[in-house]
Amino acid sequence: MSLNVDNVKEVLVKIAEVVNENKEELSQLDAAIGDGDHGHNMSRGFLKVVEELKNNSYDDIGSIFKKVGMVLVSNVGGASGPLYGTAFLKAATFVNNKKEIDINDFSVCLQQAVDGIKIRGKANVGDKTMLDVLQPVSDLIKDLINQKYLAKEILNKAVELAFQKVEFTKEIVAKKGRASYLGQRSIGYKDPGAYSSYLILKCISENI
């Protein structure tokens, strides 16, 4: 697995398409335990990302991630914009000036993103957030790299785990965001941020 600047841009366009296609479902999930706007906010933000990618040229992947992060922070409402934006901005610091990335780079970027989300959101695994997907997936990817699995196998297994972890969020009480106001009543519902994280990981796996 090796992605250059153009490959990364293509994957981001695909992510925007997937988010847009699933915006109603994401917002419906959010309506059950939040503000009901997660899908539409995410769609708006990623469509703006596509617009920026088409209207500008980039010499390296770090510059792309930095732009994506800034666009998401500026254009996605609620908690999602700052969190997803922070994820890309943190990843950008690692791939700064890189023109190609491989599975090892992706693994570091993902953990950088997770660390940024933890700090920005003051959250951790078990709080019923996107971290319930992203941290276990990051840990799995690192483990499979050490076991010398091929990149495609790693990503396939990561997506399987991500799906399981989305389902797991139905079983726990929300401790962050508007959903936390519901207390025990938040049990039984998927976390929309966890689900959008799964969709993005699945899209990445299918398009590289």
Swiss-Prot record:
User: Which Gene Ontology CC terms are recorded?
Assistant: cytosol
Entry EC no(s) = 2.7.-.-
DhaL domain mapped to chain residues: 6-206
Print the keywords alphabetically: Kinase, Transferase
Task: Report what the protein is called.
Answer: Putative kinase MCAP_0235
Q: Which GO terms describe its biological process?
A: glycerol catabolic process
Write one Pfam family the protein is assigned to. Answer: Dak2
Q: Which PANTHER family match?
A: TRIOKINASE/FMN CYCLASE (PTHR28629), TRIOKINASE_FMN CYCLASE (PTHR28629:SF4)
Q: Which GO terms describe its molecular function?
A: glycerone kinase activity
Sorted alphabetically, which NCBIfam families does this protein's record hold? Answer: dha_L_ycgS
